[in-house]
Amino acid sequence: MTTVAMQQASAKMSTSAVAVGWVLRLIAAVILLQTLFFKFTGAPESVYIFTRLSEFISHLAAPIFGTNFAAMVARSEAFSRVGSGVMELVAAALLIWPRLPWAGAILAFAATAGAIASHLTFLGIEVQGDHGLLFGLANTVVACSIGVLCIYRAQLPFVGRHFQ
């Protein structure tokens, strides 16, 4: 979509849609940015979560790819923790950038949908006594991402022209 087409799509949005869009974008971005400190510094809760993730994937991969691959995956906690943080940093930046909120919403949705799936499978809703806070924050980001995608649907590549 060209810059002119994006501006025309944005110009057609009501003031309230623009305001709600910004609120949803900022909520999701703040939540994503807040978690980066814990991921990048190797906070014990983050290390615990990504160690469990690595063990879970290793357990699933062993029958398919063999024990050597599974052992390598089991040791990938730091890589997956920092990689997840980088993905969330990019998502937050794209959410805030006025030209690409839809891209940030897609990336934020993907990252946090994975977190929700982890909570619902092997982590549990409550992780190390957090009373479900991380699970709730992930659900909030997913809800905000869906809202952003609905509001900025006209800017989506390939399909956006059908919403104008």
Roles of regions detected by a PLM:
Residues T2-Q164:
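Membrane-interface extramembranous regions
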